[in-house]
Swiss-Prot record:
It is a multi-pass membrane protein. It is found in: Cell inner membrane. GO terms for molecular function: transmembrane transporter activity. This is Putative multidrug resistance protein MdtD. NCBIfam families: PRK10504.1. The chain crosses the membrane at residues 8-28, 45-65, 68-88, 102-122, 134-154, 161-181, 191-211, 215-235, 263-283, 286-306, 338-358, 392-412, 426-446. GO terms for cellular component: plasma membrane. It holds the Pfam family MFS_1. The gene is mdtD. Belongs to the major facilitator superfamily. TCR/Tet family.
Amino acid sequence: MTGIRAQLWIVAFGFFMQTLDTTIVNTALPSMAASLGENPLRMQSVIVSYVLTVAVMLPASGWLADRVGVKWVFFSAIILFTLGSLLCAQAETLNELISSRVIQGIGGAMMVPVGRLTVMKIVPREQYMSAMAFVTLPGQIGPLVGPALGGFLVEYASWHWIFLINLPVGVVGALATLWLMPNYTTRTRRFDISGFIMLAIGMATLTLALDGHKGLGLPPLAIAGLILCGILALAGYWWHAKGNSSALFTLRLFNNKSYSLGLIGSMSARIGSGMLPFMTPVFLQIGLGFTPFHAGLMMIPMIIGSMGMKRIIVRVVNRFGYRRVLVSATLLLAVVSLSFPLVALMGWTLLLPIVLFFQGMLNALRFSTMNTLALKDLPNRLASSGNSLLSMVMQLSMSLGVSTAGILLGVFAHNQVVTNTPATHSAFLYSYICMAIIIALPALIFNRVPADTGTNRNLPRASAKAANR
């Protein structure tokens, strides 16, 4: 194995660990709740803590890699992720599990962006597409096997193993990084620590406020304090960034209409879409009485639909345009999402994989189109900052979505659920109705996309062949 090929394998395993962990936990939440003696309706904090940490730490990852070197940052990311996994497996209370997920999230936040940067450093630019296709393939496999693997481990072993399986991969990856990966550094500008702290406080406090009453049991006064603190922190960042060329994210990004619409639309849309991976396995297990493994297998059609749609997205957008694709996909996703509990509660369980397949297709169509809309017209000097802000907003909105789903289910179930009962069915149905409305609302934003927004081109055949080697 050549040196470069070995280094690409290291990055690929990092991608696999991170993407696997984003999906493997969802199926295990009801079993975790039973083991820890917790209400299943409080378990969304296990997901929120991880995703929110990733969102907060993302802006610092690229700067750290440039300053300290990709080798040491990637090594530290793997160590933190592996240590967090070990602590998660040893957790005996929900608070211990949440704290361990924060450690995991710090490692996960650095793993993927630093991995991309590593690939840029170790391969010639003309081979970058082929190299990225190689390292991201395991990352595509992670979400495909994650739900089923998580369900299998929970059903036939225990939920602790969804974290313990990271240990051997992490140890091998860390040793391989020390042995094989070169340490590239780059001269960097001074890091905007003030802006970073204000954004981190704003994101964390507002998300905690949303999750505070149902998930954390905070009193109303504490929640009001968190909201006020979050608003002041974000307002402070806005004031700090005005006319500041060294700000973490320049406000000049919002002078670009496509970027503004894409970013705002992406955040609002991902709040709705972020509810689905959390609610689906919980509904299947608590609402319908499925086993964890069965619920995990049911998630596979959604991933297959998502992967299949990615192959034809460019043709669909070129044929119908950004505005029509985004508005139509958003409204259709709302309808399909609401049809999922309706089909299930009418007893047509054989149709559920088909519904989930279309849900995955529509999600992929909307995600890819939103991302392209946001970045396609940015000038080169703003591309890096714009992409980093978009990545952060994507993670933040997912955490907000999971928190919102947990709140809805807690409100309609009155914080008590019994598996596969009429009262539980009603709670899930009302929650899905609200989710469908939230999913549909971003269509109002996407309807403002100019009708003449430009088209896209497929990759040349030669490049496509290179990417598939």
